[in-house]
């Protein structure tokens, strides 16, 4: 099966979040299942050409693409995804992609991704490569299914091509003015109140993708159900409800070549499910780095997160004094809204022997926090999938999470499971989005930590689970087949 995997970020070239990890890992697993995959990505100026060995594609040469009535010149560069034979095609248009960041608030943000989508299709035409499925990701590629079914329907190359849209976060929808009709050359009869592309008087790229993709999925089962409700659907629950039979949830996988405490190149000490002694050595190393005195009887709670409202830091702030009165130590890594950054800076200044904070992002430190922490906190308001709780399971850092999205699909509350006679709990969770519920779950974890035999059982329950990409890729293959059946 031939798959065109279209994404606006991909490890190791360009990354702002989890989408880059998906794009860098899933295609390789699909190849192992017999798929022929090509990846399509914008060539941002932030991508180092010489470092990655990008080569200009003379086979494709210059492509003139009309956006907003203006012809833009597009070129393509190619590369092989590291450790694979997968071709990566970089859409090069300096006018749109040579910016200071991957996503911008510039007034032509819509044009950037209209051009990207059209250029992907025209690259496929130049290659004369007819994919069975075009796999789109998030709003930036949301117009692709419409383009294939309408704007480019004259080309028999795409007669049997199906489309799949993966929603990584419904909160980001690509909502622009109706001038997009002209800019993208979309038929005017598609734009009307409540129509397939209209949202709040404008045009939503995400809604267009939901309306025209053959199959839709999101990145966990629970999130797929949640986005059908007003609480989580962000205004798109009605159109999602119409497509409910075509909506699926597939949990993201993780790359255990990178995230494994037995082999992790970022750790000073390695350890395994059979010998956890190295975990405390990492904890000691981490705490010493922040000038905090290690104590094996005091739990260390780690946080690695964007410091934004979605991640639950408002309810964290509500109970700050109660949390700091618990007999626990804290290491926090992240950046985001000023008020939350300031909150954690202030904490580490006021409680230097208890709280360590690093504002920014540090990849090595993120690995060390997973390895050194006894617990890992994710009190998210909503979480489409979440990866850090899965890393935490592997590293024996017991997750404390709000029961939402992918967190609900991966974390089983120890006390809840115990109540029903099961011994497979791997963390602690809470339902109610409140400071009180958050506090009680952390308090429970801190109390259970005193019982070393029980704690080790919770750790090993998590460490033995398998969330590798292999299982996820098999499920995507099933969805590709479903999409093709629908297209026929």
Which residues make up each language-model segment?
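Catalytic cores of nucleotide-sugar-dependent glycosyltransferases that transfer UDP/GDP/TDP-activated
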Residues: 1-488
């Amino acid at each position: 099966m031939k798959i065109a995997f279209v994404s606006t970020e991909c490890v190791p070239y360009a990354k702002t979040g989890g989408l880059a990890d998906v794009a860098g890992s899933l295609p390789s697993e699909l190849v192992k299942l017999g798929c022929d995959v090509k990846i399509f990505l914008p060539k941002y100026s932030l991508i180092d050409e010489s470092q990655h060995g990008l080569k200009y594609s003379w086979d494709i040469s210059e492509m003139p693409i009309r956006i907003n009535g203006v012809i833009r010149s597009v070129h393509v560069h190619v590369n092989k995804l590291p450790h694979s034979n997968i071709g990566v095609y970089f859409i090069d248009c300096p006018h749109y992609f040579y910016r200071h960041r991957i996503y911008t608030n510039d007034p032509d943000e819509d044009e950037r991704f209209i051009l990207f989508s059209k250029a992907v299709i025209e690259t496929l035409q130049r290659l004369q490569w007819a994919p069975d499925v075009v796999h789109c990701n998030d709003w930036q590629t949301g117009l692709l299914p419409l383009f294939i079914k309408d704007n480019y329907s004259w080309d028999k190359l795409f007669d049997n091509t199906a489309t799949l849209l993966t929603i990584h976060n419904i909160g980001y929808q690509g909502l622009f003015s109706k001038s997009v009709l002209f800019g993208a050359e979309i038929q005017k009869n598609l734009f009307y109140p409540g129509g397939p592309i209209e949202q709040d008087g404008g045009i939503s790229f995400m809604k267009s993708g939901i309306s025209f993709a053959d199959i839709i999925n999101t990145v966990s089962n629970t999130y797929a159900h949640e986005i059908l409700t007003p609480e989580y659907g962000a205004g798109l629950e009605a159109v999602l409800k119409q497509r409910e039979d075509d909506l699926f949830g597939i949990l993201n996988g993780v790359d255990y070549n990178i995230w494994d405490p037995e082999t992790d190149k970022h750790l000073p000490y390695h350890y395994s499910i059979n010998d956890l002694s190295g975990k405390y050595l990492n904890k000691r190393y981490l705490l010493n780095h922040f000038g905090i005195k290690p104590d094996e009887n005091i739990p260390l709670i780690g946080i690695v997160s964007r410091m934004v409202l979605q991640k639950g830091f408002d309810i964290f702030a509500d109970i700050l004094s109660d949390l700091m009165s618990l007999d626990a130590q804290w290491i926090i890594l992240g950046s985001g809204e000023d008020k939350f950054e300031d909150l954690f800076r202030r904490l580490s200044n006021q409680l230097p022997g208890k709280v360590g904070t690093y504002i920014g992002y540090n990849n090595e430190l993120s690995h060390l926090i997973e390895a050194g922490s006894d617990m890992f906190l994710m009190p998210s308001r909503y979480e489409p999938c979440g990866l850090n709780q899965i890393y935490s399971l592997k590293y024996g850092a017991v997750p404390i999470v709000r029961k939402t999205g992918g967190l609900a699909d991966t974390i089983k509350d120890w006390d809840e499971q115990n109540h029903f006679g099961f011994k497979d709990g791997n963390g602690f969770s809470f339902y109610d989005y409140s400071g009180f519920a958050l506090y009680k779950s952390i308090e429970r974890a801190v109390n259970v930590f005193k019982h070393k035999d029980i704690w080790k059982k919770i750790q090993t329950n998590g460490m033995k689970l398998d969330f590798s990409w292999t299982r996820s890729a098999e499920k995507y293959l099933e969805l590709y087949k479903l999409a093709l059946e629908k297209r026929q």
